[in-house]
């Protein structure tokens, strides 16, 4: 039986990086040159792409992606659209432009947002389920525009008149949509609107239950989704070295720092974040929550809070466990991100079957219409065809 192939993405740490968590000790200046280094390393090492985080704790993902992309050749960029923060028509134009200037190397991460405090700071005062209503309306308009349709819609949250996109994306009908949402409302939106359902790194049994739940809803609606997972990784040449590195990563984290971080996470209405917090309960004593799955990162970091820990063979075996339950995309990271990008690729890639062979440079680079747009509304070729 042949081993299933996977896509492996890395991570651009636009919110900060360093050798240790929860401290300025060993911290690293994260500037443009450093992010470019990581992106170029990921490109040269053969990663499928990189995820860029979103939110007020990090640099703007669209600006960073458009800045570093010209320094890479094959690397894809998983960048967030934010329903409720962006108009779907403006987001569609941004998407098409970045897809065009990267020659089809854009992936889209749909982020509804699970922190009410941050949401209010950005002008969003809707409750949990209402935000997913906005996400559904947003994605319907957004996908129609990218697919070349004219849009007129009056929804509960979004109203568009004569919406259209003059410059289409390179990828047809649009770049792939990735989406994570563990609540019933999130899953309900995902199965109707996106291509890949994402989960944070829960134990395999819990991930299998979640996948089965999503598939059941999707099958009932005649839809089929693929699945991805977001994990950290601590891989070394021996298991002992890997576990030592895991303990080193949190050696400067104080109990006060953990308590403060957990209070912040507790205010969130994200079901996924709640599930992450339940894995460790804010305590250090039982952080290996499943064989070689360590929850230490989640003591102080929001979002993805678990890491695969072990030697290369062990980490590869755990990845294959997730593959066996339906995961085909792994979004990985490690501290510091430059060194760990090399370490993970050099030690683990040879043990995996990777589906990274597609050559995006073969896509047709649509450089736009010949001649200037007429009246801010028509491409010259279209105007001529109507005469």
From Swiss-Prot:
Keywords attached to this entry: Flavoprotein, FMN, Monooxygenase, Oxidoreductase
Catalysed conversion reaction: an alkanesulfonate + FMNH2 + O2 = an aldehyde + FMN + sulfite + H2O + 2 H(+)
Gene3D superfamilies: Luciferase-like domain
SUPFAM superfamilies documented for this protein: Bacterial luciferase-like
A Pfam family of this chain: Bac_luciferase
Single GO biological process annotation from the record: alkanesulfonate catabolic process
Residue ranges, annotated region (Disordered): 365-387
Role: Catalyzes the desulfonation of aliphatic sulfonates.
Protein family per UniProt: Belongs to the SsuD family.
Name of this chain's protein: Alkanesulfonate monooxygenase
UniProt source species: Bradyrhizobium diazoefficiens (strain JCM 10833 / BCRC 13528 / IAM 13628 / NBRC 14792 / USDA 110)
Taxonomic lineage from the root: Bacteria, Pseudomonadati, Pseudomonadota, Alphaproteobacteria, Hyphomicrobiales
